[in-house]
Design a protein with these regions (language model features):
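N-terminal Rossmann NAD(P)H-binding glycine-rich loop of SDR-like oxidoreductase domains
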Residues: 5-25
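Short beta-strand element of Class I
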Residues: 28-30
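N-terminal Rossmann-fold cofactor-binding loop
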Residues: 32-37, 53-54
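NAD(P)H-binding glycine-rich loop region in Rossmannoid oxidoreductase-like domains
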Residues: 52-97, 102, 108, 128
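Active-site Tyr-X1-5-Lys
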Residues: 144-158
Length: 158
């Protein structure tokens, strides 16, 4: 039986490559996108699409329920969706942290928790670490984000 994977943020740079990776591995691959997302880099006919609204938990639950009824759940979810540019700092929190909370809570409430859930964060969580020494960042380094984006991504990891 083929494994099923959902890549959220699939219209983005990293997400589009992860969709390709799922297809190359023979997985049934869903591209999780917003209704308004570009499909420019998602042209392969094998890609299945899931329109997801992370900003509205009830709408998201409706969308996930529809998917569950038609296809079941996913074996793997790679969560890349998020915002990188906002007019107001608090919008980073809504678009990254609250959206991730909505997604995880909806999956739990609908009993759609996958075998594996991977959250894609950002180097921005570390802030200006090792700027002068150019040493590699390690898991032991302390995260000290200095942007609203970095703070929202770090908060989403927890």
């Amino acid at each position: 039986m083929e494994k099923k994977v959902l890549v959220t943020g699939a219209s983005g740079f990293i997400g589009s490559f992860l969709v390709e990776g799922g297809l190359e591995r023979g997985m049934l691959t869903w591209a999780g996108i917003r209704k308004t997302s570009s499909r420019k880099y998602l042209q392969d006919k094998r890609i299945r699409f899931a329109e997801l609204n992370f900003g509205d938990k009830e709408k998201l639950k409706e969308q996930l329920t529809g998917h569950k009824q038609e296809h079941g759940g996913w074996d793997y979810i790679i969560h890349c969706a998020g915002v990188t540019k906002c007019l107001h700092q608090e919008d980073f929190d809504k678009g990254n942290y609250q959206a991730t909370v909505n997604f995880v809570e909806a999956l739990k409430e609908l009993e759609m928790v996958p075998e594996r859930f991977m959250y894609i964060s950002s180097l921005s969580i570390f802030g200006p670490i090792h700027e002068e020494s150019y040493e590699p960042i390690s898991e032991k380094d302390e995260a000290k984000p200095n942007t609203a984006y970095g703070v929202s991504k770090l908060k989403s990891e927890k």
